[in-house]
A protein has these predicted regions:
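Bacterial N-terminal signal peptides that target proteins for export
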Residues: 2-10
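Intrinsic low-complexity/disordered segments
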Residues: 3, 22-23
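Bacterial N-terminal signal peptides
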Residues: 11-20
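Scaffold/interface architecture of coatomer-like assemblies
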Residues: 24-364
Length: 364
């Protein structure tokens, strides 16, 4: 009886010891997980009829190599704050003749306030190697003086070139200069929308040369610029006037022309309609010629691939400076797998609006 009680007391003591030695009961833990969503920003230009419309992410359809990507956000670039653009004016004196450098810089100098109205402006001169002549600035006066100074120096060379025609750059020089441009931009990763104003000439059509190397070099550079998000504005401003603007024909005009009977003289004379020229710069005959000039084909390809434009006359600049602030920024989800470094085709549509946005054609 005593042994049994002793064992009972011993068992109770062990149990109490275990209870006293056990850690106090902790409150249930709560876990928080941070979800890392990878996004890529793409700047697009919308059709004029969608300007000012309220759009949502579901209005956009983004295809990468033909496969849809989720659009997570969409908003006008103006919501990123006043003057959100990063502007880089890149004057290549090897790719551009003195005349092109003179007229292009002079035209930009006259729009210095429009440039700085977009955002910060940096001016780079590539004599052979690129170098910054004006660090990023938002002061219109500084930008104007810098560009006017470059135009003044180019004018002296242009006047000298009237008696000594400079030889165009060789295929090797074209490729080398574009490589230097890409290397210069590779060190820059601006946040938000960014545009490259490239002062350069085109090249002679391929049949006039032994190879198509310049076209290939421009094509490859254009794809890399597009994949980096640069909006390419190619400037090859000319001396001559763009011509007298022509009013576009209305549907009624086209119908009357198509149904008119040749040689008919009966009845009253047709009414004479006075119509104002269209607001589009394509109303200027020589502006249209820019896009069919074989020598400018490399620059046109650059502008197309990057959702930019080709400027050959200063009358085109006001429309450009009015259009850039109206662009939209959309963000698409990125795959979890690491980027493979290859270039992928990019298309941005608005199916509900039956429209397609102008977007960079390539993504990396």
């Amino acid at each position: 009886m005593t042994r049994k009680r002793h064992r009972s007391l011993l068992s109770l003591a062990v149990l109490l010891a275990c209870v006293d030695g056990a850690p106090a009961q902790q409150p249930p833990q709560t876990f928080s997980e941070q979800l890392d969503i990878r996004e890529r920003e793409i700047v697009v230009a919308l059709p004029d009829n969608l300007a000012g419309k309220a759009l949502r992410p579901r209005d956009f359809q983004v295809l990468v190599d033909g496969r849809p990507r989720e659009v997570t956000r969409a908003e006008p670039v103006s919501r990123e704050g006043p003057a959100p653009w990063t502007i880089l004016v890149y004057v290549d004196r090897v790719l551009a003749s003195p005349g092109t450098v003179f007229y292009s810089n002079l035209a930009l100098a006259e729009h210095a306030r429009d440039l700085t109205g977009l955002g910060s402006v940096e001016v780079v001169l590539a004599d052979a190697d690129p170098g910054t002549v004006l660090p990023p600035s938002r002061e219109p006066r500084q930008v104007e003086q810098t560009l006017a100074g470059l135009a003044g120096k180019a004018r002296i060379e242009r006047d000298r070139a009237r008696t000594e025609v400079p030889a165009p750059p060789s295929d090797l020089q074209v490729g080398r200069q574009l490589d230097k441009l890409l290397a210069f931009l590779a060190a820059r990763h601006p946040a938000g929308p960014h545009a490259l104003f490239l002062v350069a000439d085109g090249s002679a059509p391929a049949p006039a040369r032994s190879t198509a190397a310049p076209e290939t070099a421009f094509r490859d550079a254009s794809r890399l610029l597009a994949a980096s998000g640069w909006v390419g504005v190619a400037l090859a401003v000319r001396r001559d006037a763009p011509g007298t603007p022509v009013a576009p024909k209305s549907e009624l005009d086209l119908f009357e022309e198509g149904t008119a009977t040749p040689g008919a003289t009966n009845g009253p004379p047709p009414p004479i309609r006075g119509r104002a020229p269209g607001k589009s710069t394509l109303a200027f005959p020589r502006v249209i010629d820019l896009f069919i000039d074989a020598r400018l084909a490399p620059l046109h390809a650059l502008a197309t691939a990057t959702a930019g434009t080709l400027i050959g006359y200063d009358v085109q600049l006001p429309a450009l400076f009015a259009e850039l602030p109206r662009r939209w920024a959309i963000w698409i989800s990125e795959p979890e797998a690491p980027a493979d470094g290859r270039l992928h085709t990019l298309t941005v549509r608005l199916p509900r609006r039956k429209a397609e946005a102008r977007a960079p054609q390539w993504l990396r």
